[in-house]
Amino acid sequence: MRIIPRTMSTQHPDNAKVPEWAKSEVIEGEDEVKEAFLAYSMYGVHEVMWDAEGKDVDTHVVRKLLSNYPDYFREHILGKDVFLTYRLPNPKVEGADRKVFAETMESIPITYDLAEKFYGNGITVPVFEVILPMTTSNLEIISVARYYEKAVANEDELELYDGVKVKDLVGEIYPKVIEVIPLVEDRDSLQNIDNIVEGYYKVIKPKYMRVFLARSDPAMNYGMITAVLSVKIALSELYKLSESLNFEIYPIIGVGSLPFRGHLSPENYEKVLEEYKGVYTYTIQSAFKYDYDYDKVKSAISSINNSRIGPAKILEKYEEDVLRKITILYTERYQPIIENLANAINDVSVLLPRRRARKLHIGLFGYSRSAGKVSLPRAISFVGSLYSIGIPPELIGISSLSNLDEKEWDIFKQNYVNFKHDLQTAARFFNWESFELIKDIWKISEDTIAKIKEDIDYAESVIGIKLGGIDYDSRKHILMSSLFLLSFKEKILQESKKYLYEMALIRRSLG
């Protein structure tokens, strides 16, 4: 049996600090190849996700890794000891990137040939897994697996002319199959994940399956509590399915440093391991790696790698029904507020520092993320914008919990163990001055302000959260938030950008 990675380094652009080895503030090109090597060698991460989604991808990454760092990769075999996993664009969703999907798939046999030359015949398959984002049905992942088998691996048998086959020209094509990891990002698909996985299992018959649960995008689209509870439902469903099919399923969770995006940081990883029992692989995003002291980061990654994997909490039907009800109530409260803050979020997001060469951050084309009726930036910019205007998104929608009875509240607390801790961590950055300033700058309605105030009041009076600065860093952040809003109002944008960067350094994450 292969090693199932415990940690997966990603290229999420959530870091405030720029690593010393980067040639510029935007990490791209050769720097991303170097970053992959450093993730393995310096940080001890088991797996690197190589992202072809929403950006220009370098499909020669394996060639560059093996030729630039031969000593390391002779000792640590790519595909056996450490892993490289492609994240594809979803051709159903990202129409402009359909051919990037094809190009990335076509590059997999090239990596096989390179590894054969480097390691010897039959030693390893360096890239054998791909991640499909925004998966909503089993048909999508079945199509990806079959596309590779039929359109890539089997093309070596095509006859070109007069008995001459493709393999006579370019050699035989390996590997013959690839493993597809669905990345599930929307609420309904997370809560019905068993249908996606079981459908794939019945057709493809894999020996095991890795399933990637998003935690960041569902938080942006439906609210933090909806995201957490949807992941808990998904983990329970996957473990039930694993037992009923007698088939191993290894969940991955996509988590960032701030509470809204998962709260996996070098300072909070133990609580996240406790929160998401049953998860095999945790994403190590850029803020985790670059916004904390290196020794602390390396130690945290080592601890995650060596931690025990506990079984997921299996939910009874009545518990699952309660959690589903909470996610609906929460989303109904959360989304209208976000829709009314969308102009503010979009205006601030374009001023945040850029850390990766990502295409199309906003708009209906390509990479817009939509919550209800409006277009929003990507999740990192979304979170960074709300923190920067002094309204951490973790607080939005909280008062919907007032609709729960005592039994429902108990079920909620049992299934979101670190709820109060996550909320308190975020609430330190709440700025009371924001209301007047955002009303003035973006003409935010009295009704929206009143709803946020209800959420704030509920967090304070019912949950017992202390809002606002309680230490030097949080007080400084609140001050910077007011200065940012004032400079933005006066259109002194260079100063606005400076304050945004300073706040990100304090949070140890852009968003």
Curated annotation (Swiss-Prot):
One of its GO terms (molecular function) is magnesium ion binding. Its EC number is 4.1.1.31. One of its GO terms (biological process) is oxaloacetate metabolic process. InterPro entries: PEP_COase_arc-type (IPR007566), Pyrv/PenolPyrv_kinase-like_dom (IPR015813). It is an enzyme of class 4 (lyase). The keyword Magnesium applies. Its cofactor is Mg(2+). It comes from the Archaea. Keywords: Carbon dioxide fixation, Lyase, Magnesium. It catalyses: oxaloacetate + phosphate = phosphoenolpyruvate + hydrogencarbonate. Belongs to the PEPCase type 2 family. Homotetramer. Catalyzes the irreversible beta-carboxylation of phosphoenolpyruvate (PEP) to form oxaloacetate (OAA), a four-carbon dicarboxylic acid source for the tricarboxylic acid cycle. This is Phosphoenolpyruvate carboxylase. It comes from Saccharolobus islandicus (strain Y.N.15.51 / Yellowstone #2) (Sulfolobus islandicus). The lineage of its organism: Archaea, Thermoproteota, Thermoprotei, Sulfolobales, Sulfolobaceae. The gene is ppcA.
